[in-house]
Amino acid sequence: MALDIYPAIDLKEGKAVRLFKGDMQSATIYGEALEFAKMFEDMGAKWLHIVDLDGAFAGIPQNLKYIEEILRTTHLQIQIGGGIRNEERIRLYMDLGVSRVILGSIAIKNWEFVKTMAHSYPIAVGIDAREGKVAVQGWAKESDICSSVLAEKFAGSEVQAIICTDINRDGALSGINVSFTQDIACRSGIYTIASGGFASSNELEILDENPYISGVIIGKAFYEGKINLKEALALFENKKVKI
């Protein structure tokens, strides 16, 4: 299968921002989130990856009205993460029309809960790691759980996807950590999306040729003009048609 491309919006007070290695103090504001969502749809995107940064730090969703506006205004399928730590909040997003919910911090504390939720809801697990250790609460705290061990917890589960981010590369335009992503994919056996550090269109073919990596999240590379997203989306959509 051809690589799935997920343009990304990190939401902070309704704005599309990008962080450098997960540091909220380094946030660069690019503009209104809704305008970028519409732009991505016009470029041919089918999916949109959204992180509610305010929600990730607060522990509860903080940008609901902006997410609802994007859902109402576009036809994009949205996967959303940030501050979603119980079934009530999962249902809240499902009722809004979100296509997939990302569980991160709760996946470390209670992976059985996550597997139970995956039986009833479209769930992705976010594995965000720094030097192999999983970080939580908006990456503000580091756990003692190894990313590879956490990935193995979801092998054979109904979790739809694992989104793995190398925090030290996120927003740094230094390239996807392919070996880290491949390890997560092999240990979980689940559709795996690479995130953190995507730098240029040259990486797309490398990722596409890797049988273990199914998708990639593109954020700062687009916002900084490092990739022609419209061309990339068209290229891989055509590949899917041919398949």
From Swiss-Prot:
<dbReference type="InterPro" id="IPR006062">
    <property type="entry name" value="His_biosynth"/>
</dbReference>
<keyword id="KW-0413">Isomerase</keyword>
<protein>
    <recommendedName>
        <fullName>1-(5-phosphoribosyl)-5-[(5-phosphoribosylamino)methylideneamino] imidazole-4-carboxamide isomerase</fullName>
        <ecNumber>5.3.1.16</ecNumber>
    </recommendedName>
</protein>
<dbReference type="InterPro" id="IPR013785">
    <property type="entry name" value="Aldolase_TIM"/>
</dbReference>
<dbReference type="InterPro" id="IPR006063">
    <property type="entry name" value="HisA_bact_arch"/>
</dbReference>
<keyword id="KW-0028">Amino-acid biosynthesis</keyword>
<dbReference type="InterPro" id="IPR023016">
    <property type="entry name" value="Isoase_HisA-like_bact"/>
</dbReference>
<dbReference type="Pfam" id="PF00977">
    <property type="entry name" value="His_biosynth"/>
</dbReference>
<dbReference type="GO" id="GO:0000105">
    <property type="term" value="P:L-histidine biosynthetic process"/>
</dbReference>
<dbReference type="GO" id="GO:0005737">
    <property type="term" value="C:cytoplasm"/>
</dbReference>
<dbReference type="InterPro" id="IPR044524">
    <property type="entry name" value="Isoase_HisA-like"/>
</dbReference>
<dbReference type="InterPro" id="IPR011060">
    <property type="entry name" value="RibuloseP-bd_barrel"/>
</dbReference>
<keyword id="KW-0368">Histidine biosynthesis</keyword>
<dbReference type="GO" id="GO:0000162">
    <property type="term" value="P:L-tryptophan biosynthetic process"/>
</dbReference>
<feature type="active site" description="Proton acceptor">
    <location>
        <position position="10"/>
    </location>
</feature>
<dbReference type="GO" id="GO:0003949">
    <property type="term" value="F:1-(5-phosphoribosyl)-5-[(5-phosphoribosylamino)methylideneamino]imidazole-4-carboxamide isomerase activity"/>
</dbReference>
<keyword id="KW-0963">Cytoplasm</keyword>
<comment type="pathway">
    <text>Amino-acid biosynthesis; L-histidine biosynthesis; L-histidine from 5-phospho-alpha-D-ribose 1-diphosphate: step 4/9.</text>
</comment>
<comment type="similarity">
    <text>Belongs to the HisA/HisF family.</text>
</comment>
<feature type="active site" description="Proton donor">
    <location>
        <position position="128"/>
    </location>
</feature>
